[in-house]
Amino acid sequence: MWYKVLGIVSLCSVYVSTQGSNLQCKIAGGGELIPIRTPEYRAWVPLGEVGLNVSDSKVLIFAARSCFGAHILLQNNAEDFKNAVYEIVIGGMKNTRSGIRQCVGCKFDEWVKDKALNCRFFNYFWISWCGDEVWVGHGYRPPHNRILRYKYENQPVINAASVRSESDTYWAL
């Protein structure tokens, strides 16, 4: 069953620094639920091709049902999967850790041990790229339940996002 709770709201406040400053960060999507399935180890699925534009947004809220390895790629250019990207891995390494890195497949810049994914049920997540930090959290209420935070020097503008997976994954975006 797909839950309409993932309908995207227009704006949210996201805390983006340790000083507690606020930015109004637009959330990707227009309220329509987009279901996607990514078979294991296939090519990236650009979200723009399925109707989700992130170019004027700073937050992505989604749900994933997977045994392990849900990958989200934040990109400067929708056609470039290698340069000026951030790869967020949720439930990687057989669902033992999640992390953020500046290139596909390289060493994590920041990671945590967790069992974020579930083979039978959807779990909700959010990703924020407000300011010069990338945040990742559980649930659908950023900035609550943050699990990852990483500050990048000279962060490129995020204009696109793509998804893929290490195991058969169902997404609700």
Curated annotation (Swiss-Prot):
Where is this chain glycosylated? Answer: 53
Coiled-coil stretches noted in the UniProt entry, renumbered to this chain: none
Query: Which keywords has UniProt assigned to this entry?
Result: Glycoprotein, Secreted, Signal
GO cellular component assignments: extracellular region
Found, by tissue, as follows:
Component of the acid-insoluble organic matrix of calcified shell layers (at protein level).
Q: Where in the cell is it found?
A: Secreted
Cleaved signal peptide residues: 1-20
Q: Which cysteines are joined by disulfide bonds?
A: none
Q: What is its main location?
A: secreted
Give the source's domain of life in one word: Eukaryota
Q: What name appears for this protein in its UniProt entry?
A: Uncharacterized protein 5
- This protein's species is Haliotis asinina (Donkey's ear abalone)
